[in-house]
Amino acid sequence: MEKFRVIGSTQPLVGEVTISGAKNAALPILFASILAEEPVEVANVPHLRDIDTTMELLKRLGAKVERNGSVHVDPSSIDEYCAPYDLVKTMRASIWALGPLVARFGQGQVSLPGGCAIGARPVDLHITGLEQLGATITLEDGYVKAHVDGRLQGAHIVMDKVSVGATITIMCAATLAEGTTVLDNAAREPEIVDTAKFLNTLGAKISGAGTDTITIEGVERLGGGKHAVVADRIETGTFLVAAAVSGGKVVCHNTQAHLLEAVLAKLEEAGALVETGEDWISVDMTGRELKAVNIRTAPHPGFPTDMQAQFTLLNMMAKGGGVITETIFENRFMHVPELKRMGAKAEIEGNTVICGDVERLSAAQVMATDLRASASLVIAGCIAKGETIVDRIYHIDRGYDKIENKLNALGAKIERFRESN
């Protein structure tokens, strides 16, 4: 199993980094390509394990898929309608295959998915939404099976709770439904907006993405087209926090400030100088005192849960005692005990973590537990005294495109290695 060896330093992280395309947009867009009857080209797709798994899954369904810079998908040859367990077991996003399959082919089945172990992420909202569009759903032998005679039917759907994943499933399926679908209490994340842009490029008629009411006028078919994936706002935020906690200055290119306004506001509150341009953001912490901030995670445009672990680390290194409340997922403080192994001060009370400040962390052997928490451990290693070993880095590879190379370019000392048995 691969690990990171991180040599800590008091030197600030300084330099420039190019942000990759957003995994959370690239995945639904690749699955949404199932809806098309002609070839599509998707640019700015990050190099990640989940992307590779998705491309393999599309191939298993019969699509022609190749990557040379952009990802090219020809879904016209799809002739299988089942996403099998051996591919799905590592990745929750595979549920996004179900809506497009039943919408275009009248049938689809997906093995109940795996992925990060952060709380309950039931597929109920996906299933309920597809049922309201007229699909018959059954659970058999560990598979979610969907079927419809003829086309799905447009409907007025009010989501029981805000869900990014279910919003994408319903929006994608409704593009080929007969009639108009109105989706109320929809999630508003930038990745949903980007998926809608992609579908509209292929001929869909979607309006209101980015608001809590999305309207989809069903069309009979989708053609081909080209699309570039939106920047990864979480990767952007991760590198900006790395600059802040190390007392450095980092410029992130190929990203936009409007994608993470809540994060930038909290960085400014923490004492950082934040500057933005059309396609870049910089954080400068040189000679500034890091101040703790209070955070409450919330659906977009609130503070993103995927930045919670990074700001937990920030609060541990900052003056004062910051309080972070997690409202999206339960069981999302698994990074806290690992950071405490490095000398951090923090107490968990229910869905809240209260951080104390320490002068400097000490190196330790720590274990990555989920995708975003893992990044906070790597950054902690960069600023700790001594040599930190981060285990189970496959979690990081699921969401960050060459994180060690990008951090090393800023002055970090991170080595990927495989421990011999």
Curated annotation (Swiss-Prot):
The UniProt entry annotates the active site at 116
Q: Which residues carry this modification: 2-(S-cysteinyl)pyruvic acid O-phosphothioketal?
A: 116
UniProt binding sites for phosphoenolpyruvate: 23-24
- Give the pathway: Cell wall biogenesis; peptidoglycan biosynthesis
Entry function? Cell wall formation. Adds enolpyruvyl to UDP-N-acetylglucosamine.
- Give the protein's recorded name: UDP-N-acetylglucosamine 1-carboxyvinyltransferase
Q: Which NCBIfam families match?
A: murA (TIGR01072), PRK09369.1 (NF006873)
The Swiss-Prot or TrEMBL record annotates one GO molecular function as: UDP-N-acetylglucosamine 1-carboxyvinyltransferase activity
Q: In which compartments does the protein localize?
A: Cytoplasm
Q: Report which reactions are catalysed by this protein.
A: phosphoenolpyruvate + UDP-N-acetyl-alpha-D-glucosamine = UDP-N-acetyl-3-O-(1-carboxyvinyl)-alpha-D-glucosamine + phosphate
Which species is listed as the source? Vibrio vulnificus (strain CMCP6)
Cite a GO CC annotation: cytoplasm
What keywords does the record list, in alphabetical order?
Cell cycle, Cell division, Cell shape, Cell wall biogenesis/degradation, Cytoplasm, Peptidoglycan synthesis, Pyruvate, Transferase
* E.C. number: 2.5.1.7
Is Nucleotide-binding one of the keywords UniProt gives this record? no
Q: Which InterPro entries match?
A: Enolpyruvate_Tfrase_dom, Enolpyruvate_Tfrase_sf, MurA_subfamily, RNA3'P_cycl/enolpyr_Trfase_a/b, UDP_GlcNAc_COvinyl_MurA
Q: What class of enzyme is it?
A: transferase
Q: Which domain of life is it from?
A: Bacteria
Cell cycle recorded as keyword = yes
Q: Name one GO biological process term.
A: UDP-N-acetylgalactosamine biosynthetic process
Residues holding UDP-N-acetyl-alpha-D-glucosamine: 92, 121-125, 161-164, 306, 328
Q: Which family does it belong to?
A: Belongs to the EPSP synthase family. MurA subfamily.
